[in-house]
Swiss-Prot record:
GO terms for molecular function: 5'-3' exonuclease activity; ATP binding; double-stranded DNA binding; helicase activity; hydrolase activity, acting on acid anhydrides. This is ATP-dependent helicase/deoxyribonuclease subunit B. It comes from the Bacteria. The heterodimer acts as both an ATP-dependent DNA helicase and an ATP-dependent, dual-direction single-stranded exonuclease. Recognizes the chi site generating a DNA molecule suitable for the initiation of homologous recombination. This subunit has 5' -> 3' nuclease activity but not helicase activity. Keywords: ATP-binding, DNA damage, DNA repair, DNA-binding, Exonuclease, Helicase, Hydrolase, Nuclease, Nucleotide-binding. GO terms for biological process: double-strand break repair via homologous recombination. Gene3D superfamilies: 3.90.320.10, P-loop containing nucleotide triphosphate hydrolases (3.40.50.300). Despite having helicase-like domains, this subunit does not have helicase activity. Its cofactor is Mg(2+). The gene is rexB. It comes from Streptococcus thermophilus (strain CNRZ 1066). Disulfide bonds: none annotated.
Amino acid sequence: MKLLYTDMSQDLTEILTEQASSYAQKGKRVFYIAPSALSFEKERKVLEYLPQSASFDITVTRFTQMARYFILNTSNPKTQLDDTGLAMIFYKVLLHMGDDELKVYGRLRKDSNFINQLVDLYKELQQANMTVLDLQHLDQVEKQEDLVRIFSAAQDLLLAGDFDNQSKLSAFFKEITSGHLDEALSNTVLVIDGFTRFSAEEEALVALLNDKCHQIVVGTYTSQKAYKANFVYGNAYQASVDFLRTLAQTYKVIPDYVTTDKEGNLSFARISRLLESRHDFSTVDETVTEQDKHALKVWEVVNQKEEVAQVAKSIRQLLADGKRYKDILVLLGDEESYKLHVGQIFRKFDIPYYFGKEESMSSHPLVEFVDSLERIKRYNYRAEDLLNLVKSGLYGGFAQEDLDLFEYYVNFADIKGRHKFLSDFTANSRDKYNLDQINALRSQLIEPLDKFLNSRKQKGSSLLKKLVVFLEAVQLPSQMFELSTKASEAEKEQNEQVWKAFTHILEQVETIFGDESLSVDDFLSILRSGMLACDYRTVPATVDVVNVKKYDLIQPHSAPYVFALGMTQSHFPKVGQNKSLLSDEERSRINEATDEHRRLDIVTQINSKRGHFVAMSLFNAASEQLVLSQPQIINESQDDMSVYLKELLDLGIPLVEKGRNRFEAKGDQIGNYRDLLSTVIALNSSHLDLDLDKETQTFWSVAVRYLRKRLDKDQVLIPKVIDDVTTTKVDDQVMQLVFPEEEPLKLSATALTTFYNNQYLYFLRYVLELEELESIHPDARHHGTYLHRVFERVMGDSSSESFDDKLEKAIAQTNQDQPFEILYTEDQESRFSRQILEDIARSTASVLRDNAAVKVECEEVKFDLLLANSIKITGIIDRVDRLTDGALGVVDYKTGKNVFDIQKFYNGLSPQLVTYLEALRQTYKVDADQLFGAMYLHMQVPQLNLSQIGLEKLAAQAHKELTYKGLFVASETEHLTGGNYDLQKTVTYDKEDLETLLDYNIKLFRSAAEVIRSGNFAINPYTEDGKSVQGDQIKSITHFEADRHMGQARKLLRLPKKGKKEAYLELMAKTEEENQMQVSENTISFPVIDHAVRVDKKDQEDNHVD
């Protein structure tokens, strides 16, 4: 064995390539061994350093792959299993064990994470040259017994099924020991590069090969100073020194310090020596130079997005300076959190990149198909799982419209569970749904699915056949083919990989579970676990790309230019954690009890020395320039600076603050035109009225000049940013169809309120007739109808029974009404709602019990009022009461709190009670002095704060809550005094005032009708204070934003509280000619002062929102 080491300023790969080339020239077969994660990069570098750029006698590979070269022709009839197959073996083993057989792991028998941990431990034991019987001295005897029982059963199953139960290196080891490979190995040379430690399995193999091979050359990085030091704990090179010394002592070899004629980057060499001296507590007569500060830079950026953008700009500048993409390497401290930012921003900057990380297949439609299938069975046909299955794009050739209809109905009827999906759908809403069509669709969707999922427990091979029949029934193969025909080349390759993984898993299921009795649940669980564990194999599309990977796999001299992102304390150094079934203490005790070449790794024990060595490798990763960057905020939380970056700052490396506020008139600050375009657009929405300093003005003048030239060259037109949300006039044909000219316009108090809330909301509801998603479950509308029906029956019962008996009978009869019986017996939630409604009915009914002054004239009175033959006002009055003097009044039942507010009425937002009084006036042909008022009765259980109300006042306060609230005629209040009426001065009106209210209400209807007939519906939700919007903005449709479109909101007229009623009445009394209010983009007749918003007619013509 030959041991070599060199400084990190030297290129060890070049040195070892020369060694390999010299042995190859002597006729030796050379295997250049690198760690698995670095074998591809090592192969590229070795080929670059070979004089002839290629050699048939030199093979760059890894230990396991090298073993295959020697045992490839060795007969091995046993079936090979990958990790998915091993997981199936353990699943099968645990399937036959009961919870009581495993004292520690009994509850985890079917947990996929536990099974994956068993697979990892199985492979780790192979790498440690151990068996499960070596797992002595565990914390619990029961734990040891469980693991021995599981692994012994798995080993028996592997032997019985004639599966290969040994690793590639174990098979190679046996072949070497047998002497079959002596001749081949005698002409073999191993060159080992990139290691600072061997696994126990690799260590034993190297020991065996040392006696058989012609030569083994091992090289690593360390300094002469570090290797010769007496004390290396905490040294920057501790990992490699320990590695070298162990090999030297084992094989009685003196390591040789080697160099090349090429001089490395002096700056990185000097910084390495300075850092080394800080860790070995020595002094060096060197300091950081200006050249060093240019070669190694430390950035601090606000967040990850800005950090990646700064790197992208620097890459674009390097390209402008003549560099190639392949000369640039980007390293990440946290791959997962940076992956999205790197992808989005690099694409914006037109930077091709290769992310050297396997991507999970979990988001592919076929994996979602299998996942949904398993979840449907596990959760008994949960609606969301079934809908995910049918919407995967692989389930049958159903039209998207049919799937949308099915989804809409399932959500409406709240279909859950197998029984409901197998039964005919019967729920309907005003015959809105074509149940025949939906049930036919249900049968096509559910029948093949249930036929498979309802299969009894049987052999795995039989279930596989049924699965194939099911997949053909739902046209999965043809749908996969259809998916690929519309895909890009990259997507086609992914589809091919997913399909190959799927069929491979099915083959392994056939092999392992073919004769095993399986339930559908277990069968699908096995498929799901296998598919979710699969990853795409990624290969760069071209060599000339920016490579992106995690930093802890870095080697010195990886690229000329290196950017390391996310170098915060949490990620640099990266602290390894033990997530296996064996704790660190257990591993330590096991290692103490075993002999040489048999060892379990203890990750936490090597964190410190591994972190130091990775840091030194990172600081020497670039040959020209290295940038280390840290964001202040990473993963939405603040993080501290890494200790290694602090050491660099202590040495004199300056901290460069990078950010978008550093404006400079330089090309590298502009980056490329796509980024500049997005920056200009972002700036366009900022505060442009701020004064810019001279430096910033210079930057933007250069940037805009560059952008204009580029846009003119590429003939790119920037669309105008529209700050208005105006609408276009509805087509006359549509208006004629919805509101025929020969018929009066139909309006109700609710429609009028909607109009004055937001005209566009009226357009959506009453012109387009859009509706919100319905539900079979009762909501506030159903609750209100239920209580209405109860009170109708109570008030209409003229029998001699007591009031309480009448109430209970009315509740019982209402409960038996078919619509309510269906609604309120659907499930426990519905029954609970009915119970609450019954309590509300009993509480509210106390208001009706003792009211001798009032007689119920009639209930549920429908009315149609015709105004000037052009407007037809419709509605239903819940109850009409008559006083002993003959005066009439209106009662409207409400489940929520409503009061008559004259301010809201004036602004068109509370016309209901006045409209009902107008209906009484015209229906009964009476004058205003024959009306006593209109009021709301809140149907509720009073809720009182006991901490603010004493027990002695509790009954009175509860009674006060149950009162009629509305507007009353002052002359009739004497008949109402003592009753349950809220007769405050602010809600009592004399005859003249009531006439004013009634006349003004008609003007509200006429003004609204004029706008509706015009077909111009403005997006004008109302605002009370001009600062916030209270009206319905319908943002998802109109894109109305209060901060940008406040000018288009309708501002309500608000008057001081003192004398408010009289002031509003005075305004209402004025003539329509003297008081006009604009409620749309055109000035229309409307009786309020000028508080509306004018919308420029030209803008309306130019900018349309459909």
